[in-house]
Amino acid sequence: MATIITMILVLTMILPFATLPANAAASSKSTFAYIGAMPNPVGVGQTVMLHVGIPDALSTATDGFIGLTVIVTKPDNSTETVGPYKTDSTGGTGVLYTPTQVGTYYLQTHFPEQWYNYSGYDFFGNPVSSQMLYKESYSPQLELDVQQDPIQYYPGEPLPTEYWSRPINQQLREWYTISGNWLVPTPILPNDNLYAPDQDAPESAHILWTRPVGDTMGGLAGGIDETGYGIGDAYEGKFGGVIISGVMFYNKYDSGQPQQAVVAVDLHTGEELWTKSLANNGVNYGNGRIAFGQVLRFSSMNYQGDFSYLWVTSGSNWYAFEPLTGDWKYNMTNVPSGTNYYGPNGEILRYSISQNAGWLAQWNTSSVVLKNNAGMAVAWGSQVRGKTFDAQTKGYDWNVTIPKALPGSVRIVNPLDRIVGASINATNVQIWALNLNPSNGQIGTLLYNTAWTAPASWAEGNQTINWAAASLTDNVAVLNSKECMNYYAFDLTNGQFLWGPSPPDTYLNMFDRISTINYGKLVSSGAAGDIRCYDAKTGTLLWNYTAEDLNTEFTIGNNWWMQQVIVSDGKVYLGHVEHSPNQPLPRGAPFICLDIETGNVVWKMDGGFRQTCWGGKAMIADSIIGLMDTYDQRVYAIGKGPSQTTVDAPATGITLGNSLVIRGMITDVSPGTETYALGARFPNGVPAVSDESMSAWMKYVYMQFERPSDTKGVPIALSVLDANGNYREIGNTTSDADGFFTFSWQPDIQGQYTVYASFAGSESYWPSHATSSFVVDYPATTPAPSAISLQTTYDAYFVPAILGLFASIVIVAVVLALLMLKKR
């Protein structure tokens, strides 16, 4: 249906705008009503978009003709009239209609006579005034063919099943669910719940690539003692960035450096795209560090598309840069103070409120550019390029009256929904909400103002109570008692108390406790290393996980100080932080991925991906996690990587009835494996290993830890296409820690075979396969026996001897006979 609506918009956009003479006298005009239907034909019960109107455009985007109707004659000759409808300024509009009978419908637009009066400016800014009477008209009847069988729509494309990269073809619309962006370098709790939608978040520690952050040397200094280079904690945070359309942009230097630069890296490949100071004509803007990112969805009469920006700020001045090149685009001055909220089209909103005076205003980055523009907005890019805008002059969408003297301050905002404020003290909690949704009534209307009497223990114990977390998706807010380390929850649909106090946490959490609400669950972590998950609506403890320090490395407590860094795809990722760690850093700090439903460990790396307290923490986009590891101050990309399978079979034929050996290799061919360092260590390629072996294996491959002795390989399926054309699986094997696999098999028929070795993929690798071939011959044929005399040993030796003896006797006899004759 979205496609149909887009087609209607395109059709209406191409209609010419009326050219109005300046100060024209009242006149009249014949009209020519039209009607179209898409799709046509259509299946019964399927929705049709009717295109109705006249080919006359009006002068401003908010104007439209009114009272249009559609006369429908059904296949059974009954009629109905649908409408009335108002057109947009093009003179046309789209109407949804669902036929319920099989057969031919007849559709006809009726345009009623009406005046259109206009005083203002034409497209070029010239003053005009006109009065026009548009006369009544009927469109020709349109036949709509409704058939019994439904028509087919575009089938859509499946999500990727093999390694993918950017850019993503726009036709692969379904892929938006795995290609979200990350727009805030260091999310500020409790305003941001660390939630990252539209991701297939990693379920193993597989590393795609790594590179130095570029600030200083990292890791162990060496040559002096066991200490390492400074990591920016405390007060001089390193890293921090955003990810837009598969490109990671991060701050190269720590926050205290006078000269700053931003690095752009392809998140999928690790390729550096550019490094530069965010400046214009050599003049640096602000502190040169990325403040936040933006992806704006722009739509005008003649142009629709997304525009992305990297924002640098300095006080009330904002500077926009093009992510593709790092070039400056435009500035805004006099931006009001406040918290950034992203609107439905990616616009950045801020809310100004005066509770004493009783007013509320919404400021909008898009309105700074577009509001009160003469003519029509042709394209966003050309309107902002190279310009500076005063954000105070025309950046406000509206300013409305609200009840005076609302207590406390604004706590959370959901644009186009509501704004929630609260006052919290030792004796009372008062929560109120104002409407921001025009479909639910006047903007600024008070939705509720609810007071709750606090327990006496708050005042008696001089407890510090703060607003810990809130979610307008789950409609829950929680307060935290710092000293008692328990929660109190409130319903944000009405401000009423829900539950509390929760059982107290371990004592160290009074020094640092991080709370987030996502998927209907409140997750807490902190200095105590005790991660707990509660049902946000009821307070029921669902699970808890303790990040134990089994080797007594961490000097503050028995468990690792942990904080949530990402919540995405039903998982919560936590990393170890410390306010101002001693050197050498404690060894073995974990990075953990937990199933948010069960608390089960999805994967965990001990001694890798250590986080920072003052710099940029882990972020996720395109289903890949990007982070800086403070152990070596390198940037890592964590996600599913490509694999490569090879297979070999005997090159010479084998005899039917004999066995042959099929062998091959399965390797990791992620971008990080192509460096000289890894090529030197793994000349035959980096072996692909099992998910359960991945954390220790990645430490060995990329961090030079000892090679693990219990590494397991991956399953390989072997199949053949035999000489009869039959495809069949012949068995399975598992590769070893070197990536090598072997399989013996006895072919059962003669002829040529194609053999397939297939790796189905895992949470760490995309699938791969390879082919080879071999031939099976019949055994050699044995010839039939010939009738030949067989000579025995007797024949060979005795017979010749006898014959010789006989010959001698004959000779002797002859000699004797001659002698006897001679005597006579």
Predicted feature locations:
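Residue-level recognition of secondary-structure-to-loop junctions
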Residues: 88, 94-101, 105, 111, ...
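Enriched for extracellular/lumenal, surface-exposed ectodomains of secreted and cell-surface proteins
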Residues: 101, 105-132, 749-768
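Secretory targeting signatures
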Residues: 1-26, 52, 205, 326, ...
